[in-house]
Amino acid sequence: MTHKQRAIFEPALVRTALLDAVKKLDPRVQWRNPVMFVVYLGSWLTTLIWLAILSGHTTGSAMFTGSIALWLWFTVLFANMAEALAEGRSKAQAASLRGVKKTSWAKKLSEARVDAPQEKVSADSLRKGDLVLIEAGDTVPCDGEVLEGGASVDESAITGESAPVIRESGGDFSSVTGGTRVLSDWLVVECRVNPGETFLDRMIAMVEGAKRRKTPNEVALTILLVALTIVFLLATATLYPFSVFSVEASQAGSPVTITVLVALLVCLIPTTIGGLLSAIGVAGMSRMLGANVIATSGRAVEAAGDVDVLLLDKTGTITLGNRQASEFLPAPGVTEQQLADAAQLSSLADETPEGRSIVVLAKQRFNLRERDLHSLNATFIPFSAQTRMSGVNVQERMIRKGAVDAIRRHVESNQGHFPPAVDDLVASVARTGGTPLVVAEGSRVLGVVALKDIVKGGIKERFAELRKMGIKTVMITGDNRLTAAAIAAEAGVDDFLAEATPEAKLALIRQYQAEGRLVAMTGDGTNDAPALAQADVAVAMNSGTQAAKEAGNMVDLDSNPTKLIEVVHIGKQMLMTRGSLTTFSIANDVAKYFAIIPAAFAATYPQLNALNIMQLHSPSSAILSAVIFNALVIVFLIPLALKGVSYKAMSAAALLRRNLWIYGLGGLLVPFVGIKLIDLLLTALNMG
């Protein structure tokens, strides 16, 4: 699935959003947003007053009351439109996902063997624990774990990546996703979910917002907005008896009308952020999907914005992950060429990046050409987790290369001696951030091959940006402490965890959380699952195991560990957008005071005309201008709510100052200009 950024006001989206905005006028929908529900009730009240004026049941200006009622309905519709546009973008993304999900058949097995009896069943009938055989050309019918076999799988329908991936039993690449397609070979898979619970189903549900619940910050902000609304409601309600009393006492003017009080209330309550709050949350999840990351909830996106500790795997995130041979360091009594020759021989059949780089380096340094192991009557010894060595047996020569402790045991078991000088070479390589690979022939240590893991370009600058934002970066690696310290210094991370185990990762996360910090991490293996489940933001790789994906609260479809940094940026942008628009909305009220208060009460208290600093044409024009501005500002802020405010890496204090200047001062000044321009237009049209 390819996630293209859709234009905010794309005609098809706007048409759908307009229809949805009208449907959302249902009171069962409106009451979920308390601030806009007050506007909704005000719209009905002023509409009824307008109808009463038209029918002669009460007195008043039908033109003025009708205009106020119309623009209050527009205010509600514009808020509905903002939410509908955000949801529309998500629904379009969900539609493309739903296109991936199609009815298919599965070959259900009675036991986990490729030659076991099979039964053809509908994929929708499969249950957790069922076994299926998937062959070349078949669509994977369910999410599951590969128990037998290995195959090339096309996951482009889910990830958008056209290159096929290998899925095989054992290891961290044993997970398959329903809706993908097997290109070659076969797999025996155990289903790990029931119908309706697949990864694709969860993606569709989250993208559509069907399970969207308000996040803690959203709930807290809603409580604040409701409290402000109640305060302004009580204040406005007391103005009517105050107005009646003032008119009787001064024998001047007339009591303020219900229509004017409703207009005043709507202009004073925080309708701007109230109307855009839901859209901001939906758009945050949509932007996350645009980055090819599926968030299981808005809570996860919000937590990403609050993160202050990042745990980053060294390989693939900080370094390129393909270690290259950079130097031959011979032991005393051995020439560099002798070491290079032995290292190359032991690597001729080694297809790892490290092995190929040793062959290339020997060729570059000493013009040692590749040789055919078969013609040499040689036997290649592959690497194994038990021996932690690989090598070659050539006639009487027994050459091995591997980790320091593995070669030490090998040499000593052959009654050899491990020279202290080689220990010094190993320490020297580790101190510079390299990985030492020791080469031995029989019982004799020949020297060390230095493998250099290249730190990604620009990663140090990105970590510096994160540091400015108050985020601590911690590198996680299985390397020894010396190597880890050197790479950490080169990459510019704040701390590191060397010789990391799953238990050590989990303990580190708990330690930071005990200090009140929020922790983010990535993982792809079953052994990462406990740490992923503990972390506040846990991004599981789509290429990883089912256990890892279930433990995380986000899944990266690109399986790119570096994406964690982008996830944090998107989360922070969502929080900043919400805060900026809240500041703008509350600052807006000041200009509306200066517009409506003199208009409502100047006839009784002429001294209040001094507050008419905008020199608005008439009381009715002033009130109508404020109501129109209040509605239109929601429309103008929809793009900002959906795209997010511009984001720069800086400290929280600097961000606060910047946003107060832009959105606080802007919120104060823009309404003065906007209301005055609308007043001039109404006057020119003879509507004021």
From Swiss-Prot:
Entry-linked Pfam families: E1-E2_ATPase (PF00122), Hydrolase (PF00702)
Gene expressing this chain: kdpB
Residues that, per the record, bind Mg(2+): 524, 528
Sequence positions that bind ATP: 350, 354, 383-390, 401
Coiled coil stretches, renumbered: none
Family: Belongs to the cation transport ATPase (P-type) (TC 3.A.3) family. Type IA subfamily.
Key word Lipid metabolism present: no
Self-association state and partner proteins as the record states: The system is composed of three essential subunits: KdpA, KdpB and KdpC.
Transmembrane segment boundaries: 34-54, 62-82, 219-239, 260-280, 594-614, 622-642, 662-682
Reactions catalysed, as given in the entry: K(+)(out) + ATP + H2O = K(+)(in) + ADP + phosphate + H(+)
Name of the featured protein: Potassium-transporting ATPase ATP-binding subunit
UniProt organism field: Yersinia pseudotuberculosis serotype I (strain IP32953)
Top EC class of this enzyme: translocase
Active site residues per record: 313 (4-aspartylphosphate intermediate)
Free-text function comment from the UniProt entry: Part of the high-affinity ATP-driven potassium transport (or Kdp) system, which catalyzes the hydrolysis of ATP coupled with the electrogenic transport of potassium into the cytoplasm. This subunit is responsible for energy coupling to the transport system and for the release of the potassium ions to the cytoplasm.
